[in-house]
From Swiss-Prot:
Signal peptide interval: none
Catalytic activity: Preferential cleavage: (Ac)2-L-Lys-D-Ala-|-D-Ala. Also transpeptidation of peptidyl-alanyl moieties that are N-acyl substituents of D-alanine
Molecular function terms from GO: penicillin binding; peptidoglycan L,D-transpeptidase activity; serine-type D-Ala-D-Ala carboxypeptidase activity
Outcome of gene disruption: No visible phenotype. Spores have normal morphology, heat-resistance, cortex structure, and germination and outgrowth properties.
Superkingdom per UniProt: Bacteria
Residue spans, topological domain Cytoplasmic: 1-11
Gene (UniProt): pbpI
Keyword flag DNA-binding: no
Presence of keyword Protein biosynthesis: no
Disulfide feature: none
Pathway linked to the protein: Cell wall biogenesis; peptidoglycan biosynthesis
Family in the record: Belongs to the transpeptidase family.
Membrane disposition: Single-pass type II membrane protein
Protein name as it appears in the record: Penicillin-binding protein 4B
Length: 584
């Protein structure tokens, strides 16, 4: 009996499909088991994951330390891990409950509701301590473990500056094509120092507890739980920052207590322009993009803080006579509109008289149209302040992520327009500088004119504390102000606080003597209540006689009479003094 042609075709088609399926199966199980599809999926790892329950204790990523070696991120705290299979065993529930300070019923209920291992931390068990962990582990019962885990719910200090991490498989493979061993779930730095130092922070191996389960979640191989950990004494690496944990924490507490919603504060060590504390508001929330901007690295209208530049240029060009006075009943355009009376140069600076500095700026610009930006550069306001240099294969490595540089003029034509010059002289028009640059300007003046790069990372260390890389102190390039100019600036900055009518007179009773300059910049915005909103600054240094700290506080988008700038500056100086006293 002959087989019909149609039957033959059907058999051939079946064999072709069968062969293709067989080929696909071989591709999956034999040829591309560790790098399947365009996504390079490791099928062996994924199949193991399907039948494995795990508790991640540490992802193995490098961490950040403060200047004294205290943890800023990756802080571990006691935790007790209980596996669900305990409910099927005659386990020492009474002993565990006693150690944790819980009732047996609560503990049984907590475990009974869980489909995955239960993690009990200090958030739930307030009395959990190192002693608790020791007692738990002394039970030596499978499925009950005392460990030290990273608390992801605990907010890290300096969150905007330290930055954040996220999973991005495409970016991971693009940035690190030679690191194929990294799982696609590996988190990489997306903002802040986490991003700039990402290459040094990538994990070698995570630390976890794991056990194999069947389809119903029951243990496959008895109650055997495996502990996997990084045995390398050198990795993960640690970034030792210049931040002082005590100062950083105090600054964040002050801004929270005062209720400053937008803006921030930055404190520098004047000796080498290293960051001791830096806070940006609102608090960083990775789910809300508009909270992630670090305002301390963002150019903002400086208002009258910029008069420091005009004062420096006037002093350097010998335009101010000791007996010279200014009519401060005039506004910035030289028209009637103010009521400060006749003031000397020093008192004009102390009381922030607009007319004095707009008239000086006009005279300066007639002599040299580049004088304002040149002096801004001498005072470290127009180049990004952060540390830059060579780091292995990177010739222009920058420590600070997404740091912007200041801008003075928006249009060259403005240099010949009287009103534009006047607005520029008082830190408006197109003038925008970062709070970090302003803090560095104050540090530069306090040091006698020496410009330095602002450093936030001191060194990269191995896990055992030995040094891999040290970031040396570096000077900023370009011209600087001379000793005489810096001394005269120090004098008038001190006058701002000493003068009975000075804009910084509130700081007269602080435990440190303060020198500085206030600033109020118009934003062109209104609040919901139709109130005019301003950027309110105070920038200065202390102690004035032996400068050690440079501090800038900025309250953004605030009604003038509700600004918290001075209150925050006052409280931070007090906190720094308390910390210094306690450290002695």
């Amino acid at each position: 009996m002959k087989i019909s042609k149609r039957m033959k075709l059907a058999v051939i088609a079946f064999l072709i499909v069968f062969f293709l399926l067989l080929l696909r199966l071989a591709e999956i199980q034999l040829f591309f088991t560790e790098s399947f599809s365009k996504k390079k999926i490791n099928l062996i790892q994924e199949s193991v994951k399907q039948r494995t329950e795990e508790v991640l204790i540490s992802d193995g990523r490098g961490s950040f330390l403060d200047r004294n070696g205290r943890a800023l991120t990756g802080q571990s705290e006691p935790a007790v891990v209980l596996f669900p299979f305990l409910l099927t065993q005659d386990w020492p529930i009474k002993k565990v409950a006693d150690i944790l300070g819980m009732s047996e019923d609560d503990l049984r209920q907590t475990l009974g509701q869980a489909k995955k291992p239960v993690i009990l931390q200090q958030k739930k068990i307030k009395t959990l301590s190192k002693q608790s962990i020791t007692k738990i582990n002394s039970l030596k019962y499978p499925g009950i473990y005392g460990v030290y885990m990273e608390n992801e719910d605990k907010p890290s200090l300096a969150s905007h500056t330290i930055g954040s991490t996220n999973q991005d498989p495409a970016l991971l493979r693009k940035k690190y094509p030679d690191k194929e061993s990294l799982p696609i779930t590996t988190e990489i730095g997306t903002t802040g120092l986490e991003r700039t130092f990402d290459e040094f922070l990538l994990p070698e191996q995570d630390t976890k507890l794991l056990y194999h389960v069947d389809g119903k979640g029951n243990p496959l191989f008895g109650m055997d739980v495996k502990y996997t950990a990084e045995a390398n004494t050198f990795y993960p690496l640690q970034i030792k920052t210049t931040i002082d944990q005590s100062i950083q924490k105090a600054m964040e507490e002050v801004l929270d207590e005062q209720g400053l919603k937008k803006g921030g504060a930055v404190l520098l060590d004047i000796e080498n322009s290293s960051v001791l504390g830096i806070v940006s508001k609102p608090d960083a929330d990775v789910s809300r993009q508009n909270t992630l901007q670090n305002y301390m690295l963002t150019p903002i209208y400086p208002g009258s803080v910029f008069k420091t530049v005009i004062a420096a240029a006037a002093i350097e060009n010998n335009m101010v006579k000791p007996s010279q006075t200014f009519n401060c009943n005039l506004n910035l355009y030289g028209e009637p509109g103010d009521d400060k009376g006749t003031l000397s140069f020093d008192e004009s600076f102390a009381q922030s008289c607009n007319y004095t500095f707009t008239s000086l700026a006009e005279q300066l610009m007639k002599k040299d149209s580049s004088v304002i930006e040149d002096m801004s550069e001498k005072l470290a306001l127009t180049d990004r302040a952060g540390w830059e240099g060579k780091l292995y294969h990177e010739t222009d490595f920058r420590q600070l992520y997404n740091e912007k540089s200041g801008v003075i003029w928006g249009d060259e034509k403005d240099k010949s327009v009287k009103k534009a010059i006047a607005q520029t002289a008082i830190g408006q028009k197109n003038v925008k500088v970062t709070p970090l640059e302003v803090a560095n300007m104050m540090a530069t003046i306090a040091r006698g004119g020496e410009k330095r790069q602002v450093k936030i990372a001191e060194q990269i260390e191995y896990k055992n504390g030995t040094t891999l890389v040290t970031f040396k102190d570096q000077k900023l390039k370009g011209e600087t102000i001379d000793k005489y100019t810096s001394q005269q600036l120090q004098k008038i900055l001190r006058r701002v606080v000493e003068s009975p009518s000075g804009t910084g007179r509130r700081f007269q009773d602080l435990p440190y003597t303060v020198a500085g300059k206030s600033g109020t910049a118009q934003t062109g915005k209104l609040s919901k209540e139709k109130e005019t909103l301003y950027e309110k600054w105070f920038a200065g240094y202390f102690p004035a006689d032996k400068p050690k700290y440079a501090l800038v506080v900025l309250h953004m988008d605030t009604p003038g009479d509700k600004a918290l700038t001075n209150s925050v500056f006052y409280d931070i100086v007090k906190k720094v003094h308390e910390i210094e006293i306690n450290q002695k």
